[in-house]
């Protein structure tokens, strides 16, 4: 028994110095003397850094009366030419255009506190998805038909990738007045 205790203390004695060499000292800290301790005493605002005057052209989104929708909702209403460019982008990516409409353009909970089918996330589809559509004017014509049929409804265009089975883009094409 004594021989086994001697062997274990010898092993511990040898392991001690090896562990202290395993952790390197922490180098690279600078002395606090190198950092200034006081703030600049000059209160002249002309010496403050600026971003080149871009702040004057920024606007704050009004918190009431203008709700945000989906993609591109921060822009002014899209013209027919702008819609055509977005639909061309959608078609160039081989996405299937789909038109949907809804009376309420926002998510709302009316029937239950938890999310469900009737909480405004799902809109009514206008006709069928436009499989095989190659021209933006076809999609714009369908949007115009939907606007005439439901003038008090929101109309949106969705780009659906049928290979990945996902919705890739969605934006409001028409907002009722």
From Swiss-Prot:
Classification via SUPFAM superfamilies: RuBisCO, small subunit
One Pfam family here: RbcS
Cited InterPro entries: RuBisCO_ssu, RuBisCO_ssu_dom, RuBisCO_ssu_N, RuBisCO_ssu_sf
Additional information: This protein is coded by one member of a small multigene family.
Record-linked Gene3D superfamilies: Ribulose bisphosphate carboxylase, small subunit
Superkingdom, taxonomy of origin: Eukaryota
One annotated GO biological process: photorespiration
GO molecular function, one term: ribulose-bisphosphate carboxylase activity
Family statement: Belongs to the RuBisCO small chain family.
Main subcellular location: plastid
Entry keywords, A to Z: Calvin cycle, Carbon dioxide fixation, Chloroplast, Photorespiration, Photosynthesis, Plastid, Transit peptide
Induction: Accumulates to low levels when grown under continuous white light.
Coiled-coil segments on the chain, per record: none
Native source species: Lemna gibba
Localization per record: Plastid, Chloroplast
Transit peptide start and end: 1-56
Annotated protein name in UniProt: Ribulose bisphosphate carboxylase small subunit, chloroplastic 2
UniProt subunit comment: Heterohexadecamer of 8 large and 8 small subunits.
One Gene Ontology cellular component annotation held by this UniProt entry: chloroplast
Stated role: RuBisCO catalyzes two reactions: the carboxylation of D-ribulose 1,5-bisphosphate, the primary event in carbon dioxide fixation, as well as the oxidative fragmentation of the pentose substrate. Both reactions occur simultaneously and in competition at the same active site. Although the small subunit is not catalytic it is essential for maximal activity.
């Amino acid at each position: 028994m004594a021989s086994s205790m001697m062997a274990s203390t010898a092993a511990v004695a040898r392991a001690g110095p090896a562990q202290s060499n395993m952790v390197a000292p922490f180098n690279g800290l600078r002395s606090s003397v190198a950092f200034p301790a006081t703030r600049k005493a000059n209160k002249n605002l002309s010496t403050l850094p600026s971003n080149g005057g871009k702040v004057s052209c920024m606007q704050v989104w009004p918190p009431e009366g203008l709700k945000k929708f989906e993609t591109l909702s921060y822009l002014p209403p899209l013209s027919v030419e702008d819609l055509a460019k977005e639909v061309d982008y959608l078609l160039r990516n081989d996405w299937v255009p789909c038109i949907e409409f809804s009376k309420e353009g926002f998510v709302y909970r009316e029937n239950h506190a938890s999310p469900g089918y009737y909480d405004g996330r799902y809109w009514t589809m206008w006709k069928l998805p436009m499989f095989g559509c190659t021209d933006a004017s076809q999609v714009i014509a369908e949007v115009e038909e939907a606007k005439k049929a439901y003038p008090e409804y929101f109309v949106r265009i969705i780009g659906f990738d049928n290979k990945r089975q996902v919705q890739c883009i969605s934006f409001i094409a028409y907002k009722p007045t």
